[in-house]
């Protein structure tokens, strides 16, 4: 009977879960020097109609706001039921406009069950049940829908659903919510043949905000996005973007903002007119406050591509593998009988075959590619297809940076422009590089790719909590959470950031407010997130920016993870130093000391003295 109840709870969640505006809620992150309002449909920042909202205030309680509104974008290329190739960009409901059909928002909406229905607030780790304080605001749900499958403690009632595991509160503040694109009925497309009421692309997005008041992370607000393809169709081409409305200098001083990017550190940032980037001096805020700092948004973890055969993030340099050269981009000719590499695009498995005497046909999704013998072929960038039949996908990807209007600098992404040394790849003819676990590493493969799982600390079982005696605890091998709704053990797959072959920052577009892309223009948004295009040719104006990472495929039932840091600095060196520091912290799975919990203190007044007591 218990087993039947567990199955009912679990499957009822899967069947009935869908986003709705009725589940909208908000809260405020204020766990370090940054304070900002956020909403559980993806908006970070403020609505002008909500006077209590705060948009990226730094330092906390200063009244100095740098961010108006921020939203994440997820673009997908697909074929509709009429066979037409379409682009969908799923957006957040926000003050810059939204895609609406009468009163229905065609975009992200929150799932029910992740907040306390008796409050209008998003669940946060420090706002749980507190029986000692009747006025305390309790934001947690009675149980968590995504942990209903835990056989020992279904739904984790009374426990925090933490990134690090059950009731693990590593951060000063952690928020958690889940949303989907169920209501996005814009296109003639049905992502789930078993549920024709579901629209959109069949995407579900779980989001966490994290803050530490540790000195190394006190100027950073972390945002983690887990985007899962819950449809029964593969999505062959996707891109993830972030659109940022800046008000550097505060309200009334946003008309003279500047913005730039740093490709090496995967960061985009804004600053006030007159600011000297080295010293941070010169900028003046709306009410005369000075200096005005720099606000940055950075990829700490960008989308990964574990299928292209390339070490996208450059972490495989000490292992086996040849390096990419420009000679690989030259046209090639295959005669009948020559060995070529073909890819099964449903699994991305490679096979060596002899080129046929007549023609070679390869299918990818709804596309059919036909190759003839003795005809020149060459790689086509950014189509996520192996055009030259060597098993490597898009090895000739490039980037074009518009330095000033009409003036561009071009370079290849996978070859260092100064040294000429390329990234490593797998040679599918010889097998060289196939044993390098950091080429095409993945957080979905059940493998400790970087070898950092520690049996003395990490063998805590599937729920991530030591002492619960759950599956995998103290069994001497890493236990991955892949294929479950549970986190798994530290330093493997879900809980190990380094196990992702990250693409990094692939585009940046700085545009005047009012003439930039609208949230209901899918094609324009898709075009502005074109990988390889970097534009910051306008400055000293009221402008916003859009940056992105792509392209990558997302197979059905798989999850792609992203992490964005909102961070601040007194000047550009300070901002980049903060980025590099928190990148190290992130790569080490936030492994740094957390401040001790504050004790409860009470006093007893005597004759001419006061005695203080506190708990331990």
Language model regions located:
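Bacterial Sec-dependent N-terminal signal peptides
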Residues: 1-21
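Extracellular/surface-associated beta-sandwich interaction domains
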Residues: 17-616
């Amino acid at each position: 009977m218990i087993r039947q109840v567990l199955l009912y709870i679990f499957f009822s969640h899967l069947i009935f879960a869908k986003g709705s505006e009725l589940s909208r809620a908000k809260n405020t992150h204020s766990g370090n020097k940054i304070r900002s309002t956020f909403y559980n449909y993806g908006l970070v920042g403020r609505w002008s109609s909500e006077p209590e909202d705060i948009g990226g205030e730094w330092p906390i309680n200063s009244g100095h706001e740098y961010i108006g509104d921020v939203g994440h974008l997820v673009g997908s290329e697909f074929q509709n039921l009429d066979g037409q190739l379409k682009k969908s960009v799923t957006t957040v409901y926000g003050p810059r406009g939204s895609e609406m059909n009468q009163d229905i928002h065609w975009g992200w909406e929150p799932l029910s069950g992740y907040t306390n229905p008796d409050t209008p607030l998003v669940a946060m780790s420090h706002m749980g049940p507190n029986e000692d304080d009747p006025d305390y605001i309790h934001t947690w749900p009675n149980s968590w829908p995504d942990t209903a499958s835990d056989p020992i403690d279904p739904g984790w009632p009374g426990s925090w659903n933490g990134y690090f595991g059950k009731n693990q509160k590593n951060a000063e503040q952690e928020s958690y919510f889940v949303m989907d694109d169920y209501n996005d009925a814009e296109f003639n497309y049905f992502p789930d043949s078993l549920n024709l009421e579901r629209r959109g692309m069949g995407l579900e997005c779980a989001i966490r905000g994290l803050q530490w008041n540790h000195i190394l992370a006190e100027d950073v607000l972390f945002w983690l996005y887990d985007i899962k393809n819950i449809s029964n169709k593969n999505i062959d081409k996707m891109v993830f973007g972030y659109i940022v409305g800046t008000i550097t200098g505060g309200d009334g001083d946003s008309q003279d903002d500047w913005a730039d990017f740093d490709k090496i550190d995967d960061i985009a940032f804004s600053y006030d007119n007159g600011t000297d980037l080295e010293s941070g001096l010169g900028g003046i805020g709306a009410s005369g406050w000075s200096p005005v700092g720099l606000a940055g948004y950075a990829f700490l973890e960008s989308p990964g591509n574990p299928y292209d055969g390339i070490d996208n993030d450059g972490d495989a340099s000490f292992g086996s593998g040849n390096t990419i050269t420009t000679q690989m981009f030259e046209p090639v000719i295959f005669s009948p009988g020559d060995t070529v590499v073909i890819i099964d695009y449903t699994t991305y498995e490679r096979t060596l075959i002899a080129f046929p005497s007549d023609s070679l046909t390869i299918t990818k999704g709804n596309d059919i590619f036909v190759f003839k013998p003795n005809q020149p072929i060459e790689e086509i960038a950014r189509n996520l297809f192996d055009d030259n039949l060597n098993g490597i996908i898009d090895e000739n990807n490039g980037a074009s940076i518009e330095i000033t209007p009409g003036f561009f600098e071009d370079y290849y992404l996978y070859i260092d422009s100064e040294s000429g040394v390329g990234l490593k790849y797998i040679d599918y003819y010889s097998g060289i590089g196939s044993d390098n676990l950091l080429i095409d590493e993945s957080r979905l493969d059940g493998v400790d790719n970087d070898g950092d799982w520690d049996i003395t600390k990490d063998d805590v079982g599937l729920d991530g909590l030591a002492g619960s005696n759950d599956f995998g605890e103290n069994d001497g091998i890493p236990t991955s959470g892949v294929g479950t709704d549970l986190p798994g053990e530290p330093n493997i797959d879900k809980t190990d950031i380094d196990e992702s072959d990250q693409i990094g920052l692939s585009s940046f577009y700085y545009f005047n407010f009012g003439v930039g892309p609208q949230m209901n223009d899918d094609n324009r948004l898709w075009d502005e997130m074109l990988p390889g295009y970097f534009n910051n040719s306008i400055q000293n104006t009221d402008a916003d920016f859009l940056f992105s990472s792509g392209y990558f495929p997302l197979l059905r039932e798989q999850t792609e993870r992203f992490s964005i840091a909102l961070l601040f600095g007194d000047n550009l060196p300070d901002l980049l130093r903060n980025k590099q520091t928190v990148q190290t912290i992130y790569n080490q799975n936030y492994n740094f000391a957390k401040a001790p919990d504050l004790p409860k203190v009470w006093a007893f007044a005597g004759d001419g003295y006061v005695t203080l007591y506190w708990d331990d």
